[in-house]
Amino acid sequence: FDEKSDINILTCGCSHTVGVGVNQHEAWPFVLKELVKKHTEKTVSIHNLATSGASVDYVVRTVHKTIDILNPDFVCVFWPPVVRVEMPSNENDKAVTQSFLRDDNFPKNFVNKYWLQDYLFHKNLVLLQALTTANKSKFISNTVIESMVDDIDGDYFPADSTARDGLHPGPNWHKTGAEFYFKHINQHI
């Protein structure tokens, strides 16, 4: 984390940002780094703090813990699926664990089964926008969930499944993702 460049970029998300199924240099954060270097002729650092299986809470908590240390010019997030919710595993247990909310285990006191996950996503989105503004970082995000695109910058781009594992996006999708983030970064450099 000591690396400082002319342009410092923090990236975070889930396996889509880690680059599961593609070579590291093909993952969108590292394609983005090369695009920024090529078009600016400046030094660029990428701090990819993504982890496979991450929740929206993980993303915001990770940025919160590191933004003062890394001092990024840009925070680029590819939001994980919003069904990954961190919550107590039961009422008597103080440990918070990540759970996947499904129709059959959704809390009965919520009439609309999507209300809680949408609320938690928006709460985290607002917090991350405030964090990046307070730290003078430009915040850019996108998501695997098409319905959430109205709340973030840019257009939804569907994931192809051409990665080695057959489940995650392949190199072409990562290139498209890097170009999305570069388009927004390029407006500010």
Question: What positions do the PLM features span?
Answer:
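Serine-esterase "nucleophile elbow" of acetyl-processing enzymes
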Residues: 1-52, 57
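Alpha-helical cap/lid subdomain in secreted, periplasmic
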Residues: 60-189
